[in-house]
Amino acid sequence: MTNYNVFNQSNRPLFTQLTNTFSAPGIEASPDSGAAAAGSFFALTTNNTSIPSNQNLLLQILNAAGSGRTIRISSLTGGTTAAATLVIYSGGTVTVGSTPVPVNTLLGNTNASVVTTRQNTGTLGGTFTSIASIPLTAGIFSLDLNGSIIVPPGQTLSISVGTGNQTAAINLFWWEF
């Protein structure tokens, strides 16, 4: 890097050094933005789902042991029509009701996510550990996790919203590398 003379001489104009110019911008972007531009950022939604009495809306992603990629959870959003509890779990078992397909947020990109997905209403089974439990009021929710929850190969992340007699949605966003 060039060392610039920081002292002005009386016969010259005031010294300036332009930074963040159009030809050399100094712009910072989030990891989400970089992952999206690289075709490695994904979205998964349950859409609006009616939850029967005494059940939960469940969404799960499984990162297979041999996938070769690590999942970093960017954010978790959604909504509910009544008071509920949002719980994020490590592990657990969701009986397959449907297998929603993750969408690459670089629209038109053919890169596919390595995760296996499961969605259903019911109760989470198997062995699991709660990471976070958040009481919700009716309305929208949004958690910016900024990659702070990591799902390495061979691990599972499960999310539940409930319990029942309401309509809810879960939207999960992550990047893979």
Each predicted region: which residue ranges?
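Beta-strand-centric surfaces of beta-sandwich/beta-rich domains
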Residues: 1-15, 20, 27-177
